[in-house]
Amino acid sequence: MGKDVPLLVASAPSLMAQAKEMMEGYTLKARKGLGQHFLISQGVLNKILAAADLKPTDTVIEVGPGLGVLTEELLKRAGQVIAVEVDDKLIDALTEKFKGYPNFRLIHSDILKTSPEEILGQNVPYKLVANLPYYITSAVLRQFLEAKLKPESMVVMVQKEVAKNIVAKTGDMGLLTLSIRFYGNPSLVSVVPGGAFYPPPEVDSAIVKIVIPQTTIMEGVSEVDFFKLARAGFGTRRKTLLNALAQGLGISKPVILSLLNGAGIDPARRAETLSMEEWKKLCLEYAGNPC
């Protein structure tokens, strides 16, 4: 008998090769004005999918599908994928690419002008997965976190420095950290080098996951009061809470001192040193003593 001859199996084209083929086929190019950087790393793609933790019954909203690299894998795992794309040049390409997927829906719209209710058409649980353009990161996060119909979780690609702010701990927290923690629990999944994209951005990125539970530590706290106090506290970061809140709220120092004492917070501390539990105490104290 002759020696066994190993079977030669053609490997799938790399994500970079797929991206170039699609861009050439539809005469596409990354649009700098839209902050487009297309994902070409299989390893990074796998990390996003693992973090998303999708089930066949899940509905997913994908913001900015780009060339559809992530979209294709989402479609294999979720019950429905609704992609929102603003770039009119990508619409035909995405429509053609996914015409064989009955669980795919494409919305040609600016995500910042489209609410979750408009996207979904009904009140259903959903997850958000997105490779966000840097220039709309904060706006998109705020839009979905503040929406009446919030996602169960968000897995987003953001600028590395923004990711560090999102997951910062007490002592380093800024207004962005605090805002996200009011609604959910953020965690860093992975740092992503520029080479994972085409064209590569000038800075590194990171994958962040935000889980939005039914109830949070801030349950019972007025959203309006919380953000009013938080913006005042961080408005002049180098100042003590006593001075920052007095200036930001336009309230006399004796009244602010009384609020801080009532919440058990040293007036000489700064906003970034407060834990979420302490912000809750301060908010409840403020609500119980209208100034």
From Swiss-Prot:
Spell out the reaction equation it catalyses.
adenosine(1518)/adenosine(1519) in 16S rRNA + 4 S-adenosyl-L-methionine = N(6)-dimethyladenosine(1518)/N(6)-dimethyladenosine(1519) in 16S rRNA + 4 S-adenosyl-L-homocysteine + 4 H(+)
| InterPro entries per UniProt | KsgA/Erm, rRNA_Ade_diMease-like_C, rRNA_Ade_Mease_Trfase_CS, rRNA_Ade_methylase_Trfase_N, rRNA_adenine_dimethylase, SAM-dependent_MTases_sf
Signal peptide segment: none
Q: Which controlled-vocabulary keywords does the entry list? A: Cytoplasm, Methyltransferase, RNA-binding, rRNA processing, S-adenosyl-L-methionine, Transferase
- Subcellular location(s) of the protein: Cytoplasm
Keyword Hydrolase in record = no
Q: Which GO terms describe its molecular function?
A: 16S rRNA (adenine(1518)-N(6)/adenine(1519)-N(6))-dimethyltransferase activity; RNA binding
Check the record and name the SUPFAM superfamilies matching this protein.
Answer: S-adenosyl-L-methionine-dependent methyltransferases
One CC-aspect GO term = cytosol
The UniProt annotation places S-adenosyl-L-methionine binding at H37, L39, G64, E85, D110, N131
Reply yes or no: does the keyword S-adenosyl-L-methionine apply.
Answer: yes
Task: Enumerate the Pfam families for this protein.
Answer: RrnaAD
Major localisation: cytoplasm
Q: What is its EC number?
A: 2.1.1.182
Q: What class of enzyme is it?
A: transferase
HAMAP family given in the database record: 16SrRNA_methyltr_A
- Give the family from UniProt: Belongs to the class I-like SAM-binding methyltransferase superfamily. rRNA adenine N(6)-methyltransferase family. RsmA subfamily.
For this protein, the record's PANTHER family field holds: DIMETHYLADENOSINE TRANSFERASE, DIMETHYLADENOSINE TRANSFERASE-RELATED
Biological role stated in the UniProt entry: Specifically dimethylates two adjacent adenosines (A1518 and A1519) in the loop of a conserved hairpin near the 3'-end of 16S rRNA in the 30S particle. May play a critical role in biogenesis of 30S subunits.
Protein's recorded name: Ribosomal RNA small subunit methyltransferase A
Q: Which organism is it from?
A: Dehalococcoides mccartyi (strain ATCC BAA-2100 / JCM 16839 / KCTC 5957 / BAV1)
